[in-house]
Regions:
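Alpha-helical, hydrophobic structural elements that either
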Residues: 1-250
Length: 250
């Protein structure tokens, strides 16, 4: 199996840190891309924020080293005591790719068909300045099937309400961590990221669409290249890892 071990733990004021390892005792299932797929949990009985990052992977020892950092939301000291850290999933064997998608320029639709997305299907949204996407919930209707990476498909591109929309489909995000983003590359090499993005479930609730909105004119777009950055694939390992650790204020 795969063994979890807490190497050290520290509690100082409003912050707790755990240094832990995951070691594959049977094979080579772990690698430098592995993570807990948001399944990790350490409960304090108070509201906390946290993150878990992979520090390194030792292929000779078949061991991944992680650092988990937690902080109280109100800045108050976290309580002392014995606490249980648990995780149910590991995602490994992911691959990263950077792909020229300029062929999409041949498919830009100036009058695309639009679909309305029900609020309950919208997963979330984002923008560099934190502003909500305009016309969120109105997305392009899929018309393309261009797959730049396994499990990822570009499904539509077109201008609507003054913005360029590019739509991508991630086939099964409930069992993989497939994700990515597109950018426009100007002739001078300047990279232009999406001004807004929003995400919505497919009809089955297992795959997800990503709609990226760019503030650019058709004439400006004609001079650009399109590039995609993707993380795809991966093997999901399920288990029930649990360890109890004492934490005292240092």
């Amino acid at each position: 199996g795969i063994r979890m071990e807490v190497v050290s733990a520290r509690l100082e004021g409003s912050t707790a840190q755990l240094y832990l390892t995951m070691q594959d005792l049977e094979g080579d299932r772990l690698d430098e891309s592995c993570d807990f797929f948001d399944s990790e949990d350490l409960r304090f009985g108070v509201n906390i924020t946290g993150s878990c990052m992979l520090l390194q992977y030792d292929p000779a020892a078949k061991t991944a080293h992680f650092l988990m950092t937690l902080s109280s939301q109100d800045g108050r000291p976290l309580p002392e005591g014995r606490f249980t850290f648990s995780a149910d999933e590991l995602l490994t064997q992911k691959s990263e790719s950077s792909i020229d998608l300029s062929e999409l320029l041949d498919y830009v639709n100036s009058s695309p068909t639009i679909q309305q997305i029900d609020d309950e299907h919208i997963r979330g949204w984002g923008s560099p300045d934190g502003s909500e996407p305009p016309d969120m919930g109105y997305a392009l209707t899929p018309t393309l099937s261009l797959s730049p990476a396994p499990g990822i498909t570009i499904t539509a591109i077109g201008f609507w309400n003054g913005l360029l929309h590019i739509q991508s489909y991630y086939e099964n995000i409930s069992k993989t961590d497939d994700h990515g983003f597109l950018s426009l590359i100007a002739p001078d090499g300047t990279e232009k990221a999406a001004s807004y993005s929003f995400y919505f479930w497919d009809a089955a609730g297992s795959g997800s669409y990503q709609e990226e909105l760019f503030d650019i004119s058709p004439d400006e777009l004609d001079e650009c290249a399109i590039r995609g950055q993707f993380v795809s694939g991966g093997t999901l390992i399920q288990g029930r890892w649990k360890v109890t650790v004492p934490l005292t204020q240092s």
